[in-house]
Amino acid sequence: MTAMMHRAVRCALVALLCVPTCVSAQDQSEPAGYRTEDYRAPTPATLKDARVVTTAEAEQIWRTSGAIFIDVLPHAPRPANLPPGTIWREKPRRNIPGSVWLPDTGYGALAPVTEHYLRSNLARATQGEMTKGIVVYCLRDCWMSWNAAKRILGMGYSNVIWYPDGTDGWAEADLPLRESTPEPPSSP
């Protein structure tokens, strides 16, 4: 081997050592409880007692109206310290057409009012049918949808479908997205 080849091999080895190690979804195991921090990180490939679907499977469910789609992406509130009269433009949320947007319901710990919001909107969307299919999603690598799907299972719904690629996977497949608004808060 020439000196130049030795140098190239050494450089390649150093470069490999400098590359950070990535954790894939397959390496991520399910936690016993809810994820309570670092919500934008690789998620497990599974969710006990839920069906996990690909984009193609989610599309098939959507096209056949086989389930209710629940978007749990958080909603950024108007900043509390914004001076009166300041124009506040919300960032629009584009989600899967026909979805029910229940923001902030995927956090690891929910305030009682947020849990009531989730429960009452699920009851309304499913018409109280605990076996109705419920597809839960957010964005790819977002624990919000995993947490929300786990919580919905814990509420007694038996046909929970987790779509981990969310609107990222949907958009990549060139499927339609529509601007959405959150469901209004319900009375306690």
Model-identified regions with their sequence ranges:
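Short hydrophobic beta-strand that contains or immediately precedes a catalytic carboxylate
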Residues: 58, 69-73
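Bacterial N-terminal signal peptides that target proteins for export
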Residues: 2-12
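Intrinsic structural disorder
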Residues: 1-4, 17, 85-88
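Glycine-rich nucleotide phosphate-binding loop and flanking beta-alpha elements
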Residues: 76
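Rhodanese-like catalytic fold shared by cysteine-dependent sulfurtransferases
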Residues: 10, 22-56, 61-64, 79-135, ...
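Hydrophobic h-region of N-terminal signal peptides that target proteins for export
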Residues: 15-23
